[in-house]
Regions:
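Residues in short coils/turns that link rungs of repeat/solenoid architectures in beta-rich domains
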Residues: 97, 119-120, 207, 213, ...
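Terminal amphipathic alpha-helical/low-complexity segments used for targeting or macromolecular assembly
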Residues: 1-197, 202-208, 214
Length: 272
């Protein structure tokens, strides 16, 4: 059972049920507009039963939005900040309880779960690769090719070694590709995902991403088409000018200081 696929299914179904959501009241719309918020159509904004508009300031809503209760605080870089939506533009979003989104020029087709913080970013969006890079080919050991393997989020070095060292076993390769095809089909989502307690800060471009629990992306040059599998016990960090594309970044990974990780390439020793 894949925790990643289970989460994608839950998010695709909606982070709130219909019975947990309601329309904005006229009084709430009035409060939002006094706080310099605008919407193309306030009827497309649905909120949780215990929603209050006070923490939303200076935002623009240009598509559909689901918003939870934004009470509480999050800790960012060691400092507590109040949750809320501030000076940001939203196109089609799902935002859970206790989230902070501040100074984001474009947030499009994104789900942010409780405790997430997204700050000082240009574009965070989802669209071209709706499978987060699942099924991309990873080249192992031989730069000239011949030992490629299609990746999925929970892939291990042992699995990669077996598949790449048994290239003449067509039955094994066909079965592996069939399983990856099924995984690819189930990984499809209309949403980029920022999981519980994840941090995305000071980034110009974050595209087609699954950002796992407690992961941090801070001052990365570009991060796209990638799954980050992270946890509170083993958080992932991507920072300081890193460029990450078409990758799987697993528990405890740290990519920093101008590093480039593209097309999920890395070297793993294989038997000769």
């Amino acid at each position: 059972t894949s925790t990643f696929l289970s989460m994608i299914r839950r998010i695709n179904d909606g982070i709130y049920s219909r019975s947990e959501l309601r329309a904005l009241s006229s009084a709430e719309i009035g409060t939002l507009e006094r706080q310099r918020n605008i919407a193309r159509d306030w009827r497309r904004v649905r909120v949780s039963r215990d929603f209050t508009p006070d923490p939303i300031i200076g935002c623009t809503f240009l598509g559909s939005a689901v918003i939870g209760n934004l009470a509480g605080t999050v800790t960012v870089a060691g400092f507590q900040q109040p949750c809320g939506l501030i000076n940001s533009t939203f196109y089609d979003v799902q935002i859970a309880d206790a989230v902070l989104i501040k100074n984001v020029m474009t947030l499009a087709s994104v789900t942010a779960l409780s405790g997430a913080a997204i700050m000082n970013c240009h574009t965070i969006a989802h669209g071209e690769d709706t499978h987060f890079g699942v099924g991309k080919e990873l080249k192992l050991a031989v730069e000239a090719g011949g030992r490629e393997i299609r990746i999925f989020p929970e892939i291990t070095i042992d699995v990669a070694r077996i598949i790449c060292s048994r290239r003449d076993d067509k039955e094994l390769l066909n079965e592996y590709n069939r399983l990856v095809d099924e995984y690819f089909r189930r990984a499809d989502s209309p949403w980029s995902v920022v999981m519980n307690d994840a941090r995305v800060m000071n980034c110009p471009k974050v595209l087609n991403m699954f950002i796992g629990e407690a992961a941090t992306i801070d001052n990365a040059n570009c991060v796209k088409n990638t799954v980050i599998i992270s946890s509170r016990e083993e958080p992932v960090t991507i920072e300081d000018g890193a460029y990450v594309a078409d990758c799987v970044v697993q528990w405890g990974g740290h990519i920093a200081t101008g590093a480039i990780a593209e097309a999920a390439e890395r070297t793993i020793p294989l038997p000769t």
